[in-house]
Amino acid sequence: MTQVWAEWKKEVIHKGIEGRGIPNVAVAADWDGDGAMDAMTSFDNGVTVFRGPDWKTSRQVTRFSDAYHGERKLRTSCIHGCLMDVDGDGDLDFLGSNQLVFWLECPDRPFEQDWTFRVIDEQILGSHCLTVADVDLDGKLDLVANSGRPEGTPYPNSIVWLKVPSDPKSGTPWQRKVFADGDAPGGSHYMGVGDVNGDGLPDVACGAKGGEKFPGGEWFAWWEQPKDGSLPWKKHLLSDRQPGASNILPADFDGDGKIDYFATRGHGLGALWFRGPSFEAIEVDSTIVNPHSLALGDLDGDGDLDAATCGSQLTGKVVWYESDGQGKFHRRLIGENQGSYDLRLVDMDGDSDLDVLVAGHFNRNLVWYANPAKKAIMPFPGKASLWQGYEMREFSLDQRTCRVVRPKQAAPGRPWVWRARFWGHEPQTDRAMLERGWHVAYCDVANLFGSPDAVR
């Protein structure tokens, strides 16, 4: 089956407002139960939810200056956040990081009522990432957060996991487990959770930028959860020569049954992966600038995990890396001139594929890119035959003869070469392209002299 891909279409949820905070987090869920995905981000001294699919309705569900009166001085927007059904009532609540860690209870009428603000932990400081996982395997989700500041907290340069209390609405503190106790220096950023060593227990990886203001950074590492539940966990360094290290997520990218890591340098250049179990560092893309976000998912529907990221600057590129399932990645462009501090893969339009949701950071916007519709063409119309041993279809389009020859196995990205005249005059070139997985298409439009009709 041949898959034809169009361009990714950019949809704007929120254009951004100068001087009202920078959206650094993007999450989505169907909060009002109407069958359409809604979106949420943080700016303008609070958290705002947008109703899909047309985004014409929005509501600031919590205003920080009204909701919190403690010791911490909150900023105008969260640095990160995630979703979890904290109170077990069947809807997704928002967990945010803004000089402390908090959660917002989703009410019965999420676009009409305020979301109740409750503190999770105001002792840890510098939680650049919040992510959920069942850390202790009790069947309930926990929260993983970093306490990355070197001072101003009893838990400097650390990473913790937090257990939800039996009654989360009571104000009871969440149980804090400091598993990386002072051995996560520098500017620790984002965590990835997964069983790396195959012992059945989730482990946690993290990346940290370095430099003069963040001594001890420039590393990627993972912490091994011990079987006896003791603290702290054992640290395993993946690499300490990674300027701008930020994001890291675990998965098996080469099909050998061993966990690997995909990582980006959000305060530097490039994306790479670490091949398990030795964790050899393999460069994927050395040129992408400030890829300060990362998500994994099967973007092309071929059964293996791909990666997506976006640069943080105004001129950032949104890209995805197509995986062949054997450890090779091919960079594909999604969009340009879009910044990001957070990126999620979500089916935003209900068409059963993963779209890309982006919190715009310096662009101050919240946008999503629609995954191009995959049009199955099987078979092409017309007469079937063989050309040089390859399947060919001949048909007419606008009274012009057309031919399409399929490779035996399509190359990543399913590339095509088009011939506008003189079918078969360079058979050796066409054979070489087919052997490399390219489709060869022919349509005689030479008499249209490159006009728009010829392109069509």
Where are these regions (language model features)?
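Short amphipathic alpha-helix adjacent to the substrate-entry channel of hydrolases
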Residues: 425-441
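Short beta-strand element of the alpha/beta-hydrolase
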Residues: 412-422
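Alpha/beta-hydrolase active-site loop
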Residues: 449-456
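Beta-propeller-forming repeat regions
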Residues: 4-376, 380
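Active-site-proximal beta-strand/loop segments in catalytic clefts of secreted hydrolases
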Residues: 407, 420-422, 443-446
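Conserved beta-strand scaffold positions in the cores of enzyme catalytic domains, especially
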Residues: 10, 176, 235, 392-394, ...
